[in-house]
């Protein structure tokens, strides 16, 4: 007798279709009931951005957890209309946020863009690699800087992450442009500035934000 399956699993490889790319298949596995998305580089579903795109296509962008299995992944952008999102990495999950060969094509900070309200990055190794020396190409490994619009309504929390560059004098480990922020128990190395705070069109509260328990080395400024 077959058991009734209560969970709804969707294996996604394109924005709105169940089709696979030629060669390596990219995508994510979504559990709509638990609001959990899984990116796994080893089984071919290794695209974090595709997981985010699939959540966006589902329509409900609030309260998701994106679990990153062990492996190497590309940088990603969480849109401004996402809320209460956690991106959590397993041991040996590495996000390579910078590729010097495409630096000229960047229109953002060049790393992970975590826009939205109450976004949490947890347990990730974020590798900026060999950041090019030219200014204006790459500015931060993690950022929620949103240009002239500013980060009003944004909040970003970075916990238990390792963020490393290669002795860059032109980039930040984390660039905050929001009234809500936390950096806890992270290791940051190899940047001009470990953590930078920007302020576009908002006031940062005197309480409620915290930078604590972090280790900073090989940076010009903490």
What role is predicted for each listed range?
Residues 120-221:
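Right-handed parallel beta-helix
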């Amino acid at each position: 007798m077959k058991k009734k399956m209560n969970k709804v699993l969707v294996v996604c490889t394109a924005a709105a279709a169940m089709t696979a790319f030629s060669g390596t298949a990219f995508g994510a596995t979504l559990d709509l009931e638990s609001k959990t998305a899984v990116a796994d580089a080893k089984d071919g579903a290794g695209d974090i951005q595709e997981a985010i795109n699939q959540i966006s296509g589902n329509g409900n962008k609030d309260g998701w957890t994106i679990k990153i299995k062990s492996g190497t992944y590309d940088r990603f952008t969480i849109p401004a209309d996402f809320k209460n999102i956690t991106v959590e990495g397993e041991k040996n999950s590495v996000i390579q946020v910078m590729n010097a060969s495409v630096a000229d094509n960047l229109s953002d900070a060049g790393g992970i863009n975590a826009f939205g309200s109450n976004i949490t990055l947890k347990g990730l190794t974020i590798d900026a690699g060999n950041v090019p020396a030219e200014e204006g190409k790459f500015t931060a490994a993690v950022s929620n800087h949103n240009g002239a619009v500013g980060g009003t309504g944004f909040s970003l929390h970075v916990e238990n992450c390792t963020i490393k560059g290669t002795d860059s004098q032109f980039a930040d480990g984390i660039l905050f442009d929001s009234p809500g922020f936390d950096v806890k128990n992270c290791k940051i190395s190899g940047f001009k500035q470990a953590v930078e705070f920007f302020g576009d069109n908002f006031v940062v509260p005197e309480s409620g934000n915290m930078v604590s328990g972090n280790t900073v080395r090989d940076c010009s400024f903490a």
